[in-house]
């Protein structure tokens, strides 16, 4: 099957992709900051409001039906992450707020002399919460550096930091800034051998590859639905025994059972249901491509196809940008190493600021982000502050024709 044609046909399911500027369809390369949503997500959220817009735990019809949908959404989240227990899936305002909450609870177990490890490759949501928590507990923070030439983690330094005092290692599956993929399963094994816990930020990984908390061997993992074609919502998974043992900051009437003890206040039920719809949109890709039976198997089939399609687009884009004057690709720029990175390509122009490049692309109907994307430590390390970089984010609904328009627009910058 021609995957380019297969995914091009799916564009019709995304109403926003029909947007036009200057008589041409807009090109959405802003996915790393938030993807567009398919019609099925819009329908699910609207249907929730119509059918069962009620609070949790009531004995009347709409509340009972609402709770059923929420339970189904927890199962969908478990299938997405390959978690064995749906009650270990928590929903929240966003990944940042969930991480802040968890960091507060973990900090209660730390003391002076304990150590926490973070990295300069991460989004600040997987950096600052742990710094603040460690400071409150009097714990020491170790920061893993990044190889500037290809923006990969200094894994030897990470291993050397691990010792009997290490309590937690916070690391990302993939960089939201330069696309680097980290060897998560290997890192988690090192951390586990040291007797510490691992928190994994999978936000940037989620729309591109299948997440598997069992294969990763992590203790906690968080991602965001709006990065994988859903609404603005955060998702967090943790090992059941740890989630039950920790003391979260919560209100007295709130449930002490999972998942309620980690879901502060009244949730956005419509967003939770919309997240299930986004997961089932991905499932529909797998159903169309294979003969699997379970939701998880369909997801694995879908992400296998998504990875192949996006890798082809990313390889072609990296090769084309490499031939343009005045433009630098940050991170892994060898097309032969595309398997080590996400299809997220950040660039700078030697004669124009990131802001100027983004403005010119926007005038051409090409939507990209510029700045540091909250990966503050990395942007500073690379010397890209205060302007940052221009980020070109491919997801499965992008096409080679769109990338040809992008290359033409970038070429005109040096004209």
What feature does the model see in each segment?
Residues 1-415:
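Pyridoxal 5′-phosphate
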